[in-house]
Regions:
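Conserved N-terminal beta-strand and adjoining loop/helix that marks the start
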Residues: 1-21, 37
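Short connector loops at helix/strand junctions that flank enzyme active sites
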Residues: 8, 16, 36, 63, ...
């Protein structure tokens, strides 16, 4: 049994503003539907830096103080492993805007 495997690290962030939560309607055929903003972690990038970057790219918001609140992993049909780090924050600045990833509200 090998100790090495193909793994992709991704992240998602629940952004809360009082009694509202930001969601994204993703248009990607690989991951469509209503979800939280997030994406992949680039080689050499920290998990925190990755979630801050992805939220900025997909929503126009700059988040701070993201807190890890869960981790989920699964294998696809080809034994490729995905590991998702779930974060949450109530700290952000900027103006909400949709991106080519999908609409946000």
């Amino acid at each position: 049994m090998s100790r090495r495997e193909s793994v992709e690290f991704v992240n998602m962030c629940l952004i809360k503003n009082r009694d509202k939560v930001l969601v994204q309607d993703r248009v990607s055929p690989n991951w469509p539907g209503i979800t939280f903003p997030g994406g992949h972690v680039e080689r050499g990038e920290s998990f925190i830096d990755a979630v801050i970057r992805e939220v900025k790219e997909e929503t126009g918001l700059t988040i701070s103080k993201p807190q890890l609140c869960g981790i989920k992993d699964w294998y696809d049909d080809e034994d490729y492993r995905y590991v998702v780090h779930f974060y949450k924050t109530e700290h952000f600045t900027g103006e909400l805007q949709s991106s080519d990833e999908g609409n946000v509200w």
